[in-house]
Amino acid sequence: MSAALTTLLLFVATAVAELVGCYLPYLWLRKGGSVWLLLPAALSLAVFVWLLTLHPAASGRVYAAYGGVYIATALLWLWWVDRVTPTRWDLLGAGCCLLGMAIIMFSPRSG
């Protein structure tokens, strides 16, 4: 598997872990879910933090680039979990963010 594809898949896994970790407390606080949802939420957020440590670039660069993938993944979440269809403007914005991620992560580096 190429380094670019590995990086992208790692970003997506990181985003899913963060989304799950934030969505479960939302279900508890806003939708009347069980307080027990906080346990898998905490585990998911711990996985999220661990996944961030697996990225092979400087942390600031990883966080900046990850934001673009998070936005695109959150829009998929909007569509699949919340059952709200993203608008073309949502998709255009996500495309711009993914382009930014690609520039940040895959541009040539000196030294």
From Swiss-Prot:
Main localization, broad class: membrane
Membrane-spanning ranges: 8-28, 34-54, 62-82, 91-111
GO cellular component: plasma membrane
Keyword Disulfide bond: no
UniProt keyword annotations, A-Z: Cell inner membrane, Cell membrane, Membrane, Transmembrane, Transmembrane helix
Keyword Metal-binding annotated: no
Compartments, as annotated in UniProt: Cell inner membrane
Topological type in the membrane: Multi-pass membrane protein
Highest taxon, organism lineage: Bacteria
Pfam families in UniProt: UPF0060
Record-linked SUPFAM superfamilies: Multidrug resistance efflux transporter EmrE
Coiled coil: none
Protein family (similarity comment): Belongs to the UPF0060 family.
Name listed for the protein in its UniProt record: UPF0060 membrane protein xcc-b100_1273
